[in-house]
Regions:
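The feature captures the beta-strand-to-loop junction immediately N-terminal to the Walker
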Residues: 36-38
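Conserved ABC transporter NBD signature motif
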Residues: 58-74
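ABC-family P-loop ATPase nucleotide-binding domains
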Residues: 83-138
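Catalytic Walker B motif of ABC-type/P-loop ATPase nucleotide-binding domains
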Residues: 151-155, 160
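ABC transporter nucleotide-binding domain
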Residues: 166-254, 291
């Protein structure tokens, strides 16, 4: 499987502060990829580097095998929607579409007009008077109408109400189904990612903690509940990601490639949210232990 975005030892510093450091990952082509992690993980910096809006301090990043924003042809292959869904407040919707057509050689005017009509935007209305959901739909339309091969979305629904989020994501998935666009979607809203993504990347402190097809990850992780015991007594090949214990019971979230046949365990499936929170908690606990060793 070819990688649409590939990074190795990637870092970005602002003076003496690292926003992203020693990040290595590969994001597959032809997928809707959910990128999730805590605040400060480096998600926004990574996506802005991939979009060519920032230059790395160290390491490498490639998009479609080339340096991001290496030229007009490369820029045309990538669409980007930032969290604040930037639009020009004084410009009418129609003027945004004309500007998009002027800037993008592969601009699809019919797609742009159709989407504007579908989401109910008045072409004469100024962008500054649109609601947050309407501005997000305008920004998505501008990104889609350039007909990119890769669409990068940095928390585009973070400030939207549930109905606006649903409409935005529905429009996104309709476009993906129609044009086969690769998508990288960053969000804290795991429930939204679970609805639309088929590939997951969990990023914590610039490190990829887990990555893979959502269906495969969910099938290989389970929640185990049973009489209290040492997790080290589990069969070989079972990796405990998260654990909690009471006086009488142990509850584990574990990764395994083989079925667990011990009848004393009650085994239940996990959700994407369970998975994300477990790996984020594990990364936090690992960091706490390292700090304790240093001190």
């Amino acid at each position: 499987m070819s990688a649409v975005i590939q990074a190795g030892g990637l870092g970005k510093a602002y003076r003496r502060t690292w926003a992203l450091r020693d990040c290595t990952l590969a994001i597959p082509e032809g997928r809707v990829v959910g990128l999730v992690g805590p605040n400060g993980a480096g998600k926004t910096t990574l996506l802005r580097l991939a979009a060519g809006l920032l230059a790395p301090t160290c390491g490498m990043i490639s998009v479609f095998g080339e340096e991001p924003a290496a030229g007009a042809a490369q820029l045309a292959r990538v669409g980007f929607v930032a969290q604040d869904t930037p639009v020009y407040a004084r410009m009418p919707v129609a003027a945004h579409l004309r500007l998009g057509a002027w800037l993008n050689p592969a601009w699809d005017s019919e797609l742009a007009r159709r989407r504007i009509a579908q989401v109910g935007l008045d072409p004469r209305q100024r962008a500054g008077s649109l609601s947050g959901g309407e501005r997000a739909q305008l920004a998505l339309t501008l990104a889609l109408a350039k007909r990119p091969e890769l669409l990068i979305l940095d928390e585009p629904v973070a400030s939207l109400d549930p109905l606006a989020r649903r409409e935005f994501l529905r429009g996104l998935m309709e476009a993906v189904a129609e044009h086969g666009t690769s998508v990288v979607l960053s969000s804290h809203l795991v429930a939204d990612l679970e609805r639309v993504c088929d590939y997951l990347v969990v990023l914590v402190a610039s490190r990829v903690r887990i990555a893979g097809e959502v269906s495969t990850l969910l099938a290989s992780h389970h929640r185990l509940s049973g009489p209290r015991r040492d997790p080290g007594a589990l069969p070989a090949g079972v990796e405990v990601i998260e654990e909690s214990h009471t006086d009488k019971q142990s509850t584990l979230l574990a990764r395994t490639g083989e079925p667990i046949h011990d009848p004393s365990w009650t085994i239940t499936p996990v959700s994407m949210e369970d998975l994300v929170l477990a790996y984020m908690s594990r990364a936090r606990d690992d960091r706490t232990r390292r700090l304790e060793v240093v001190s």
